[in-house]
C-alpha cells in the first residue's frame, strides 16, 4: 500500500494513460488565452485581488475552507478556476477507518481535502493536510512531513506570510520508481488553533508542477484563518 506523496505520484503516473500530445498543446493554448483575464468582482477580504490573480495568469474559481464549502478546514483560500475540490472524508467514506488512516496519513498530518487539476487540463493535485492541535512550529511540521517520505532531497526552506498567517514553505526534489528523474514539489505549513495545516503541490513531473504553480501561488496569497 502506498501512502502520502508516494500515492500521489502513482495517481499522477496512472493519469498519463489518458493524456496525449494534443492535450498538452490544448492546455498550453488555454493557459496563454487566460493570461491577462481579470477576475469577477468578489466580496471584500474573501477573494484574491483580481489584478494580482490576472498578473499570474490564473483566475479564481471560488473559495474553500469555510463552513459549507467543498472542504471545511482551519484555513480558507481561493482555488484556481476549473480545479475541483473534494473532501477526503467523502472520498474515503467506504474504506475501513484503519485503512483510510494508513492511506492518507504522512508524518504529523492527514489529508483532509484534495483539489484536482485534471478539469483544468493538468495532471496533479493540490492536497491539504491537517493535524492535531499542538505547539510545533510550521517548519518543524514540514520537516516531519517530508521525513515520512522516501526519495526527498535538496530541500529549500523559507518563511512566508499571508494575511494574518505566518508559516514556512519548502521546495524540494522527489524521486520515485515511477518517474525517470526527480521532480520538483512544494509544500507550505501554517499553525492554527485547530492544528497545523499543510498545502502540498505535486504533479506528474516538473513541467506539470510548474504549469500548476500559479494555482498554488493563488492559494498561498489568499490563505487566511477560517
Model-identified regions with their sequence ranges:
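Calycin-type beta-barrel ligand-binding domains and close structural analogs
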Residues: 150-156, 188-189, 198, 217, ...
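Hydrophobic/basic alpha-helical segments enriched in Actinobacteria
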Residues: 83, 170-174, 178-181, 185-189, ...
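Conserved polar/disulfide-associated segments of primarily extracytoplasmic proteins
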Residues: 72, 88-183, 189-193
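N-terminal targeting sequences that direct proteins away from the cytosol to non-cytosolic compartments
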Residues: 1-103, 204-226
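Short, well-ordered beta-strand elements
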Residues: 195-204
